Amino acid sequence: MTDSTRDGHASHSLHGGVYPGNLFMVVAPSGAGKSTLVNALLSKDSDICLSISYTTRKPRPGEQDGQHYHFTTVEDFRARHAAHEFLESAEVHGNYYGTSRVWIEEQMRNGHDVLLEIDWQGALQVKKQFRNAVGIFILPPSLDALEERLKKRGQDEPNVITRRLLAAGSEIAHASEAEYVVINENFERALAELECIVAATRLRFASQYARHTELFIDLGVHLPHAE
C-alpha cells in the first residue's frame, strides 16, 4: 500500500481535495484478529469513524445491517458500481465488497479520521486516489495460530477454513506494501501498537498543518513545495 509519490499534503485526493482528516486502512487475512482490534480501537478513540462497507455476502450471526455492513444484493451492488459510488470494490471468496466514496470524503472534509477494514486489493485502489492513506497490516504470529483461530471462531465449514488458509498465504505476501505491520500475538500489545500508529500519523507535519492551517500561516510556516 505504499506509494512512491510524496508531498506535503494530508489525505491528498487525486480528485483535488485536501482534507484535514486522516485515512487509515487495516488489512489482514481472515482470522488474524483485525475486527477485534479495530473494535477495541474505536471504543477507545471517538475521533475515528469506521467506514461501513457494502457487501453481497450473507450476514453472520449477530451482524446487523448498517452497523457491521450494508448488506445488499448483487444487482444493487452492480448498479452502485456502475454509478461510480464506490471508492474501491473487490470480489473476495465469491462475494462483492465496496466502500462509499461520498461518505468518506465528507467525514475527512469535516476533520474526522476514517478507518477502513479492507483487503489488500482494495487498499491498493484507495492508495491510487488518496496518496497519504496509511496502510496497516495485521499479521498472525504463525499460520498454525491462524488456523486455530479460524476453527475456534466457529463461523465457517471446514472446506471454507481450508480455502481461507490457502488465501492467507497470498494475502500475507502483500504485507510489505503497508506503511506499518502489527503482529497480533498479544492482543493488548497489538492494540497499543495500533494506538501508537494513529497518534504518530496525527502528529505528522501534513496532518497538523491541515488541522491547524491558520495557526501555521500566522507563524509563517508553509507547506513544502511538491517535487
From Swiss-Prot:
Subcellular location as annotated: Cytoplasm
Enzyme category, top tier: transferase
Keyword match Nucleotide-binding: yes
Xref: PROSITE patterns: GUANYLATE_KINASE_1, GUANYLATE_KINASE_2
EC number: 2.7.4.8
Entry-linked InterPro entries: GK/Ca_channel_bsu (IPR008145), Guanylate_kin-like_dom (IPR008144), Guanylate_kinase (IPR017665), Guanylate_kinase_CS (IPR020590), P-loop_NTPase (IPR027417)
The Guanylate kinase-like domain, residue ranges: 21-199
Gene Ontology molecular function: ATP binding; guanylate kinase activity
One Pfam family per UniProt: Guanylate_kin
Main localization category: cytoplasm
Origin: domain of life: Bacteria
CC terms in the record's Gene Ontology section: cytosol
Annotated catalysed reactions: GMP + ATP = GDP + ADP
Keyword NADP on entry: no
Residue sites binding ATP per the record: A28, P29, S30, G31, A32, G33, K34, S35
UniProt keyword list: ATP-binding, Cytoplasm, Kinase, Nucleotide-binding, Transferase
Family of this protein: Belongs to the guanylate kinase family.
Matching PANTHER family: GUANYLATE KINASE, GUANYLATE KINASE-RELATED
The protein's role, per its UniProt record: Essential for recycling GMP and indirectly, cGMP.
Protein name: Guanylate kinase
Organism of derivation: Burkholderia orbicola (strain AU 1054)
Gene name tied to this protein: gmk
